[in-house]
């Protein structure tokens, strides 16, 4: 009778132990039951006039002394292949870690003979290869390590870092017991790499049946690189993702490491807007017919982006000068070109500056200031007023004001020059409200016809309907296909000039650039139109507000993404890449769910034993299946042991 501590898991108590005289069955009972049992036993013995010693003697006598194996049904469990000779018993000194019952050496060596014990399944199912080492060099290594090494590995389990990668000793060198702390200890990654390099890649791949690299720049290209590099490459890609990323940024680093991966930029659409703002301006510079406008586009973009301050400065000037010109005159004139220029120039700058200002008080001042200047008076009113309002509730009021219409409109007008053209007309119409008036110049163009219609009415409707309608007005079209048509439209032409690049790109489907340029110039223009200060903010507002002018700014609001989509919709519908999964074959991971078809002949990684048939399942399975199952199980187990 063994006394067992309270929190011991009964499942971990071996069912039988080989001790002197053979195999002892261990009957464990919870302490309470145990106490009851002893009490009753003693009571019984007293009645019988016997003592515990007598009982012990009787038991002793009744036990066949050379313990003959019970003639029980040990038969099914007999191995078809005679079992390997069990290794001579070694004293394994180590702690028994009951949390890892499967690793106990005791049950491994001591009960390896006792196949029969059903109960010992828990302990008997010892993996020769402790689970903790599945990922290690033992996994695929071709040398069959002798048990000695495995035992050492098991005992080494606790130590966090072995002083060297696990000894690959063919020759038993004396191993000094002190750790050489001289060099820096290899990191976990280094050790893993050390392991991996000892496994031939081909072997590993054979082992892991369905294995294929994660499709991705890393491993995919790693495979193309020569096998020699492969291990190193895997090493790097696995160990130092951070190093890798940094190397991604710093070109030289990646060259130092032997990774010759092509650098594929990771693109997030959000970043596109920024990039476009920064890059397109130079593009605009080169491309735009009017470098100034391109510059201002830049200004719009850059200013819009960076420089609310920059915007502030540029915008006021641009707003004041070009905007005034562009707004009053050029808006209409500039429509074709000046609009681009005006757009680019005043808008960019106007965008930049008022944007910046607009940023601060932006709409109000920026609007008031550049818009006022730019717009002359109406813009000033529209700007100051609706702008201020627009600033506050820019879109909402803007919606009320043509400014909203204009705001959406500017988009529209920005999109379609008609707005510029319309500016004169619809602006008159749009003129209804100060913004409209203010925008009459600018927005009138913007107002165009749909704009005009839309303009007076809610910009928002205008936006929505306009965007819808927008089909009607180029902006609408431009909206729908806005940039594409915008290309068609003067504004587009303006865009075409300023955005020629953009225009071409523009709806053409060079979304990003076009959008960027469109964004820059139109932003410049659109914002100028919409709100002098609106450029960046307007875009933002336009986002917010034009969201009011939703359709419009759906593009805006969706931002580059929407931009992309919108123009993808219009211009490059064909170009939009949809990733379809063509064949749903049992692909890379079939090995995972088709596991049951184990191939008896292939060496398998140790798996948990299949559970015996459940209680209810008996009827369902024919005996034949059961027998096959058992046989498979036996073979599996024996293979495991050989492994």
From Swiss-Prot:
Q: Which InterPro entries match?
A: Coiled-coil_p8
Please list the GO biological process terms of this entry. Answer: microtubule cytoskeleton organization; regulation of mitotic nuclear division
Answer whether the UniProt record assigns the keyword Cytoplasm to this protein: yes
Disulfide links within the chain: none
Q: What spans are recorded as compositionally biased (Basic and acidic residues)?
A: 230-247, 626-643
GO CC: one term?
3M complex
Q: What does the further note read?
A: Despite its name, does not contain a coiled coil domain.
Q: What does this protein do?
A: Core component of the 3M complex, a complex required to regulate microtubule dynamics and genome integrity. It is unclear how the 3M complex regulates microtubules, it could act by controlling the level of a microtubule stabilizer. Required for localization of CUL7 to the centrosome.
What does the subunit section of this Swiss-Prot or TrEMBL entry state? Component of the 3M complex, composed of core components CUL7, CCDC8 and OBSL1. Interacts (via PxLPxI/L motif) with ANKRA2 (via ankyrin repeats); may link the 3M complex to histone deacetylases including HDAC4 and HDAC5.
Q: Which protein is depicted?
A: Coiled-coil domain-containing protein 8
> Which species does the entry assign this protein to?
Rattus norvegicus
């Amino acid at each position: 009778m063994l006394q067992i501590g309270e929190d011991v898991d009964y499942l971990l108590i071996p069912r039988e132990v080989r001790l002197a005289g053979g195999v002892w069955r261990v009957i464990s009972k919870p302490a309470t039951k145990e106490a009851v049992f002893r009490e009753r036993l003693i009571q019984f013995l007293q009645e019988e006039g016997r003592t515990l010693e007598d009982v012990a003697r009787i038991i002793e006598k009744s036990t066949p002394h050379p313990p003959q194996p019970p003639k029980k049904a040990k038969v099914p469990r007999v191995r078809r292949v005679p079992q390997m000779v069990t290794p001579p018993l070694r004293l394994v000194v180590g702690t028994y870690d009951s949390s890892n019952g499967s690793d106990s050496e005791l049950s491994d060596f001591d009960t390896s003979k006792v196949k029969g014990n059903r109960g010992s399944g828990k302990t008997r199912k010892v993996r020769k290869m402790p689970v903790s080492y599945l990922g290690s060099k033992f996994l695929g290594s071709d040398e069959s390590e002798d048990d000695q090494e495995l035992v050492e590995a098991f005992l080494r389990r606790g130590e966090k870092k072995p002083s060297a990668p696990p000894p690959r000793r063919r020759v038993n060198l004396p191993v000094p017991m002190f750790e050489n702390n001289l060099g820096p200890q290899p990191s976990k990654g280094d050790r893993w790499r050390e392991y991996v390099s000892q496994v031939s890649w081909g072997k590993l791949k054979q082992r892991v049946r369905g294995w294929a690299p994660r499709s991705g720049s890393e491993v995919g290209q790693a495979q193309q690189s020569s096998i020699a590099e492969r291990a190193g490459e895997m090493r790097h890609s696995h160990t130092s993702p951070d190093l890798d990323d940094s190397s991604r940024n710093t070109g030289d680093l990646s060259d130092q490491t032997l990774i010759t991966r092509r650098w594929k930029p990771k693109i997030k659409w959000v970043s596109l807007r920024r990039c476009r703002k920064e890059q397109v301006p130079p593009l605009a510079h080169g491309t735009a017919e009017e470098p100034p406008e391109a510059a201002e586009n830049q200004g719009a973009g850059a200013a819009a982006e960076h420089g609310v301050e920059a915007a502030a400065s540029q915008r006021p000037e641009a707003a004041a000068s070009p905007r005034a010109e562009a707004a009053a005159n050029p808006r209409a004139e500039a429509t074709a070109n000046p609009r681009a220029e005006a757009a680019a120039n005043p808008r960019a700058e106007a965008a930049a500056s008022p944007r910046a200002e607009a940023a601060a008080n932006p709409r109000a001042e920026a609007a008031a200031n550049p818009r006022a200047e730019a717009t002359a008076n109406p813009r000033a009113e529209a700007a100051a007023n609706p702008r201020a309002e627009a600033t506050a509730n820019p879109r909402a009021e803007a919606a009320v004001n043509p400014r909203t219409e204009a705001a959406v409109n500017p988009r529209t007008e920005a999109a379609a020059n008609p707005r510029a053209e319309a500016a004169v007309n619809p602006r008159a119409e749009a003129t209804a409200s100060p913004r409209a008036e203010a925008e009459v110049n600018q927005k009138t163009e913007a107002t165009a016809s749909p704009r005009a219609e839309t303009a007076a009415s809610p910009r928002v409707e205008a936006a929505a309907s306009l965007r819808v309608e927008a089909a009607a007005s180029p902006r609408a079209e431009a909206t729908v296909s806005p940039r594409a048509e915008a290309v068609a439209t003067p504004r587009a032409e303006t865009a075409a000039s300023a955005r020629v690049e953009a225009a071409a790109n523009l709806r053409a489907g060079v979304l990003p650039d076009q959008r960027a340029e469109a964004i820059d110039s139109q932003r410049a223009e659109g914002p100028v139109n919409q709100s002098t200060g609106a450029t960046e903010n307007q875009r933002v507002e336009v986002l917010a507000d034009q969201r009011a002018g939703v359709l419009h700014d759906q593009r805006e609001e969706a931002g580059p993404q929407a931009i992309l989509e919108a123009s993808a919709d219009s211009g490059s519908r064909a170009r939009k890449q949809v990733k379809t999964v063509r064949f749903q074959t049992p692909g890379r991971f079939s090995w995972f769910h088709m596991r049951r078809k184990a191939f008896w002949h292939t060496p398998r990684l140790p798996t948990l034993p299949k559970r015996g048939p459940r209680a209810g399942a008996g009827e369902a399975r024919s005996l034949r299946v059961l027998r096959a199952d058992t046989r498979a199980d036996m073979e599996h187990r024996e293979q495991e042991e050989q492994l």
